[in-house]
Amino acid sequence: KVFEQSKEKNRNLNTKTDLKDYVMDVLLKKEYSQNNFGNIEAGVGTNDRWQVRGFDGYMKGSVNASAYANLNNVNQSSVPGSDGSFWDSDSPKSIMNTKKVGVSTIAEKTGGTFYVSTDLAAQWQGVDLDEQKKQISILPQTNINKIFQNLNDSRNSSFSLNNKITKMGISYFQFQTMVDYGRSKNDDLNKYALFDKNIPSNSSVLQLFDAIDEGGRNAFDYLQNYSINKANNRAHNFRLRENIEMSQALAWGDDLIFHADASYSDNNQKLGENSHITYYLPVNDSIVSYVANDNTKTKSYSYTLEGFYHFN
């Protein structure tokens, strides 16, 4: 509503003694302007550490959209523009390479009666570990020495989709689809050798293992035992979920409500292990081997149907 301007005396004294004359009604129309904002950061550190992350937001009328990316090797898996959690101890002995990207959109019909929202996210992670150690005189007053090496190669990736359609009003309807997919692999190699004399101090762990692999006891006549353990893990998982919610306002004021939910999952995991130990002393060339393989597949289904009558 629009009124005549207050008199100067009332404005100066901040009083409302004079009644203002009514002029007219005005219908205000909401106008939207286009907005776009973004941020990008990059950094490097010691030990070849680096990170690049950024996000961008877009708003125009009834559409909001955003995108983000986080690329690094500092064990960081947050969503730029959303959260900033930092896990610095996930892989304390190695470097975790992470690539994480995503897109989110929300579309709204004028008047706020119809919405469509979509979230997409993908992530890749990898860990490489090469740990080598040489230990001399592991027992007091002895010449027992050992060397070991641990190699680990781990990779995993994931993809997720969440799409939601919502209709508001006297009748309410919401349909939601959720999809999750992931793959992972993990390879471990562990080597261990025990000697009953001092090992060459000028040879690296890798050089010592290479000599054992080529010559065995011929390379070191004081080699007691040598073990190799290999393990691998392969897995993938898939999950699909559909959810429907509906409600209808009845003419006499009550509500009729319906809900349906269905999900399907498919998981597959393969495990393999191969151990080989050779005892050179005191029993010459006594070999113990162990092999194990396991393949597990699971599929599951579930569904729910519900109906309600709500008295108002």
Question: Each PLM stretch: what is its role?
Answer:
Residues E4-D48, S62-N312:
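Primarily recognizes Gram-negative and organellar outer-membrane beta-barrels
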